[in-house]
Amino acid sequence: MAVFVANESGASDVDEVRLAALARFVLDAMKVNPLAELSVMLVEPKAMTDLHVRYMGEEGPTDVLSFPQDDAFDASWSESVDDDPTTLLGDVVLCPDVARRQAEQAGHSFDRELSLLCTHGILHLLGYDHAEPDEEREMWKVQSQLLASWDGADGADGADGARGAADGAADGGEGRRGDQGRRGDQGRGGGAGEPPAAPAR
């Protein structure tokens, strides 16, 4: 499972290696097809504002946008994937400046906020949403379980624990939608400059 992290934000305090490890951890825990590829992009506020206005119709920078790439791709894990082409699951776009502000307001670390936002963005790519109360409860529950398992494993060997915690949701909980990528703080794109399709956040 390939995760590509591109830091175009100018932020020097982003632990890109840890962010990639977290993303792989979440994808593995959610039983995502190992041939899927994910792009995580970190952008400056102006770039995020442009995406936010263009794809969400809202002013100002946001914290995270998710852009699913291939709606026809089966993201679920399978034993027989040899004949499947490698396919891009989508892009998660993060804004470190906004994340840093939110971390201060929440009273936790910048790394913790980025982990939360990246996990949130990936769940949107997998069809989770929080437009309705029941969806929000399910998405927040899975998100919390994944982050707790990541914290316990420190990104090392805890994928089994996360997988167990998220099993019910990964198989289709209330928080998932048939269409991948609604609002939550995500969008869809091939890159920060030119993402294709409508985002979720």
Curated annotation (Swiss-Prot):
Name where it's found: Cytoplasm
Q: Which regions are flagged for Basic and acidic residues bias?
A: 173-186
**PROSITE patterns recorded:** UPF0054 (PS01306)
- In short, the EC number is 3.1.-.-
Keywords, in A-Z order:
Cytoplasm, Endonuclease, Hydrolase, Metal-binding, Nuclease, Ribosome biogenesis, rRNA processing, Zinc
Gene Ontology CC terms, in alphabetical order: cytoplasm
The cofactor(s) it depends on are: Zn(2+)
Bound cofactor: record note = Binds 1 zinc ion.
Entry keyword Metal-binding = yes
Does the record carry rRNA processing as a key word?
yes
| GO MF annotation terms | metalloendopeptidase activity; RNA endonuclease activity; zinc ion binding
Q: Which SUPFAM superfamilies match?
A: Metalloproteases ('zincins'), catalytic domain
Q: Where does Zn(2+) bind?
A: 120, 124, 130
Q: Note down the stretches annotated as region Disordered.
A: 151-201
Query: Principal place where this protein is found?
Result: cytoplasm
According to its UniProt entry, one GO biological process term is:
rRNA processing
- Xref: InterPro entries: MetalPrtase_cat_dom_sf_prd, YbeY, YbeY_CS
Under NCBIfam families, the record lists: rRNA maturation RNase YbeY (TIGR00043)
Family per UniProt? Belongs to the endoribonuclease YbeY family.
Question: Function, please?
Answer: Single strand-specific metallo-endoribonuclease involved in late-stage 70S ribosome quality control and in maturation of the 3' terminus of the 16S rRNA.
Per its record, how is this protein called by name? Endoribonuclease YbeY
Taxonomic lineage from the root:
Bacteria, Bacillati, Actinomycetota, Actinomycetes, Frankiales
